[in-house]
Amino acid sequence: KLITANIELFLNYCDRFYDRQFITRDSVNKGILEKFEGLMNAYFSSDKPQNIGLPSVAYCADELHLSANYFGDLIKKETGKSAQEYIQNKIITLAKNKILEDHLSVNEIAYELGFKYPQHFSRFFKQHVGATPNEYRNSN
């Protein structure tokens, strides 16, 4: 029982220390969030979506020299959203802008954003926006 209690106490301290680092390193975390936003902008401004596909949490964490788990926890603490949700929101924002601004077809927009299949883009868009890309374009 004594060993179990000490292990439990140790793990509790580890958990508290892990959570505390997000509070004490607030300015550093804001910098990482800015770098993440810059990484997303650079990624979608380049030809990487067409060559690599959609960015993953692991890719972003690797580019920022962080572990995927730590990166995910950091983004969740700073934004209230998971890193995956953050990436998906970025894709939706870009898709909405391209649908309204560009005179590209939905297929071209899908490939430009890194989707392998336009059907996946349409399904993804409808899940997040509530309308298909064409419906969204026609309503705005």
Tell me the role of every PLM-derived stretch.
Residues 9, 16-34:
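C-terminal regulatory or interaction extensions
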Residues 1-14:
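Amphipathic alpha-helical segments enriched in hydrophobic/aromatic residues interleaved with Lys/Arg
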Residues 4, 26-66, 85-104:
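A short, Lys/Arg-enriched amphipathic alpha-helix from helix-turn-helix/homeodomain DNA-binding modules
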Residues 71, 120-121, 125:
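Short hydrophobic/aromatic patch on the recognition helix
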Residues 58, 69, 105-108, 118-119:
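Residues within helix-turn-helix
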Residues 78-116, 138-140:
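Terminal helix-turn-helix DNA-binding modules in bacterial transcription factors
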Residues 123-140:
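…primarily DNA-binding HTH/wHTH and HhH modules…
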